[in-house]
C-alpha cells in the first residue's frame, strides 16, 4: 500500500475514535461495524485475540480475559491508591511486576501478562487498521490525545504505546485543546472569544479555558481529574443494584464476575436511557443462581447516587477560572465534550454555575477530540489547506515542576499553565566543599505536598573537588508533547555533564519497547492467520448451504435432473458434516474442501445457465429471454452470503423477464467488481 496521510486518534478510556484531514475537511472514520467510535477493549480467547466491538460483545462470556480501562493503568505504579481501588471493580487480574502493573490473562491455553502500554498499543493498532481500510493506504504518522491533566509518566507511556503499535507519534496533545480546535474551525471564530471546554468522558475529566482569535488557540489554564467519568457513574449504579439484589433475594453476586459484568452492561444502557427518559428498566434473565432480575431506576435516584461526583465537576471549573484570572462572566462559550456531558444533571449544574448561560452543544461530543487531533496531524505533516494553514496552537503544562534540594526544600522551576514548549534554567550548587556529586529529586507539584508526584532523581557525578561550591546549571525542557527532559552543565569546568535519570515511575526502557514492537508484530501476524482461517471457513460454509438451498428450491423443479440434484446434495451434506467435525481446521483444509465442492457443483451450474439463457455464441444471444428469478437463484448459489443483499437490491421484481443483454448490462455489470463473476467462465457480460 502507498503511504497515507497522518491521522488523529482519540485514545479513550472506554471508546476510541480516529479521524483524517483530507480534501480540506476532517472525516471521522467508521470501523468495520459501521460505528464511528470503537470500544477500547482487548479480549483473549483459546483461539484468537479480539479488539474493539468484537471484544466488548463477548465480555460477559469471558470477563477475566477481556481487558479494558488500560488508560486508568497507564503510567501509574501498582501501589497507586487509584489502581488498588480500580482493581476491586475489574474482572481481570492485575499483578505487580517490580512496582509496575501488568494485566494477566489466559491466551491460547497459556498465561500471559501485558503492560498497560501494550494493551493500549493493541487498541491503537486497531484504530490504525480502521484508518488504513478506509484510506486504502498505509498509515504511519499520528497525533494521539491524552487528558490535559495527564502527568509526565502517563504522557510518555501513551507515546510508547503509539511506538509499539507501529505509529510515529507526531505529537501528544491535550483532549480539551483538540476539542477546542474542532469548535473553533466549526464556528469559524474570528474576533477574540474566551471558550471553556468541559470534557467529561468515560474515565477522565478536563476543563480548559482558551482564547481563540483568528486561528490562534491559546490555552489560558487547565484543570481536571484523571479518574472521573462515566464508568464511575456506572459503578455507583452497579453497587446500588448489587445491594438491592442482596436485599431482595439474600444472595451476594459481587464475587461472581460474569453476573457483575452482565449487570454492569445493563447499568451502562440504563444510564444512557436516563439522559433522554426519566426512568429506565433493568431486565436480566437468570442473573445469578437462576434468579431473573427485573428492576428499574429513576433519573432522580441515579442523580442522588452520583450527587457528590456530579457536584465535584464544578471544582476544576472554578480552579481553571482562577488560574486564567477570569470571572465567569468573561466566558463567551461553554463547550460540552465527552459522552458523559449528555447527563442532564451535569448540564444543569454547569448552566446554573454560569448563571443560566446557554451551553454550546454544536460539536459531536464523541468525535470532537479526534476531529481536532486530525487537524493537528495535518498541520504537523505539512498540509497547506486554507482552513488550517494559519492555525496556531499554544498549549500549557498542567502541573508545576520543581526540585527538592537539600533539607527537603521544594524549588518550583516551571509553574503550571506555562505555555509549552518551554525551557527554564536554574543554577544549583553543592551544599559542602569537595562534594563529588549532587542528587536532586524532580517532582510534579500537586495542590498539596502529599500530592507531589516524584518523576525521578538525577545525579550529577564527577564534580572535581573544590573548596568553593561549584555552580551547576540545570535546564528543564518541556517539549510540545508535555514531556520533560533534563540536562545540566558544570559551570566551573564549562563542560556538560551527563545526568542519569532513575525513574521511580518505571518507564519502559528502549529494549522493552523494541521487544514489545516485535511481539505486537507477532500477535498481528497470528491475528491475520486466524482471520484468513475464519474467512475460509465462513466462505465454505456459506457456499455449501447456499448451493444446497438453491438446488432444493422448488423454482428449479424440472430444470435440474434428479441425478445432478442428488450429486450436489450429497457433496454439500458431506462438506457440512466435515465442517461440524473440523471446527478448528487450518485455512488450507477449508480451501481444499471448497475446491472439491466446486468441482462437483460448477459443471452442473454451467449446464443450468446454458439451458436458461443460452451461452454466448448461440443464435440471437442478444435477444434471448432469461428468467430473472432463475439467474438470481444461481448467482446467489455462487456468491458469498453478504452479496445476496447486493443482488436483491440491484435487481427489480423477480416476476419480470429481461433479455440477457439488459439483465447483464444493467445489473451484473454494476456489481461485477464486487462479485468477481469473471472467475466463472460460463458467465459473460455482453
UniProtKB/Swiss-Prot annotation:
Gene3D superfamilies: 1.20.1270.10, 3.30.30.30, 3.30.420.40, Actin, Chain A, domain 4 (3.90.640.10), Substrate Binding Domain Of DNAk, Chain A, domain 1 (2.60.34.10)
Region feature Nucleotide-binding domain (NBD), mapped onto this chain: 2-386
GO molecular function: ATP binding; ATP hydrolysis activity; ATP-dependent protein folding chaperone; heat shock protein binding; protein folding chaperone
Keyword Acetylation annotated: no
InterPro entries registered for this protein in UniProt: ATPase_NBD, Heat_shock_70_CS, HSP70_C_sf, HSP70_peptide-bd_sf, Hsp_70_fam
Annotated GO CC locations: cytoplasm; cytosol; nucleus; plasma membrane
Region of interest called Substrate-binding domain (SBD), as start-end residue ranges on this chain: 394-507
Gene Ontology biological-process entries: chaperone cofactor-dependent protein refolding; protein refolding
Record keywords: ATP-binding, Nucleotide-binding, Stress response
Pfam family for this entry, one: HSP70
CDD domains, sorted: ASKHA_NBD_HSP70_HSPA1
Described purpose of this protein according to its UniProt entry: Molecular chaperone implicated in a wide variety of cellular processes, including protection of the proteome from stress, folding and transport of newly synthesized polypeptides, activation of proteolysis of misfolded proteins and the formation and dissociation of protein complexes. Plays a pivotal role in the protein quality control system, ensuring the correct folding of proteins, the re-folding of misfolded proteins and controlling the targeting of proteins for subsequent degradation. This is achieved through cycles of ATP binding, ATP hydrolysis and ADP release, mediated by co-chaperones.
Protein family per UniProt: Belongs to the heat shock protein 70 family.
Comment block on domains: The N-terminal nucleotide binding domain (NBD) (also known as the ATPase domain) is responsible for binding and hydrolyzing ATP. The C-terminal substrate-binding domain (SBD) (also known as peptide-binding domain) binds to the client/substrate proteins. The two domains are allosterically coupled so that, when ATP is bound to the NBD, the SBD binds relatively weakly to clients. When ADP is bound in the NBD, a conformational change enhances the affinity of the SBD for client proteins.
Protein name: Heat shock cognate 71 kDa protein
